[in-house]
Amino acid sequence: MDIDVIKDKIEYCLQILREKDQDLLDIEVNERTITHKLAEYIQDQFPNYDVDCEYNRYEKDTKRIRSIKNRSLDITKLKKYQIEKLIWEDKKALTIYPDIIIHKRKSPNNNLLIIEVKKSSNNKGEDFDIKKIEELMEPPYKYKFGLFLRIGIQNENNKCKWFPR
């Protein structure tokens, strides 16, 4: 699928989110609530794919990042962030839970898009989310595209940073 088609579909979903769920953005519910609603709209636009939130599997294994320390973001520093999504199982790898993914379950060659979301009111963990996107676009996961999405709260504009492979 072409990146421009994907961008148009995601933009449309963000418009629907604003139209139907502005109240959630106004009261600043947690990011998981927002990503769940957004994923519902994304699923409608990608009917031939599975759209999952907080999905931590790669085939039968747990989805992990092993080489992030070698990519200029020290894992020990990440522990200082209060990032709820991390499970520190050992010092060399960590279990990750991408906010939204568009993929085909049990088909690792069909990983289309990983989306990491932050509310505009949340400035913590952006560097980690971007590194997570970059890592998941590499083997073995090989997502074709990545998106870091800063959701505008209380009528602020959304900001999208796209990552092509």
Language model segments and positions:
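Surface-exposed cleft-lining segments at the edges of enzyme active sites
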Residues: 21-27, 87, 117-121
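Active-site metal-binding core of divalent-cation-utilizing nuclease and nuclease-like domains
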Residues: 50-108
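Conserved catalytic cores of phosphodiester-cleaving nucleases, focusing on short active-site segments
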Residues: 98-104, 111-121, 133
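Mg2+/Mn2+-dependent nuclease catalytic core
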Residues: 120-138
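Nucleic-acid nuclease catalytic cores
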Residues: 138-164
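A general structural signal for alpha-helical elements within enzymatic catalytic domains
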Residues: 43-47, 138
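Charged, often low-complexity linker/regulatory segments
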Residues: 1-43
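Feature marks short, surface-exposed loop/turn motifs that line or immediately flank catalytic pockets
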Residues: 16, 57-59, 121
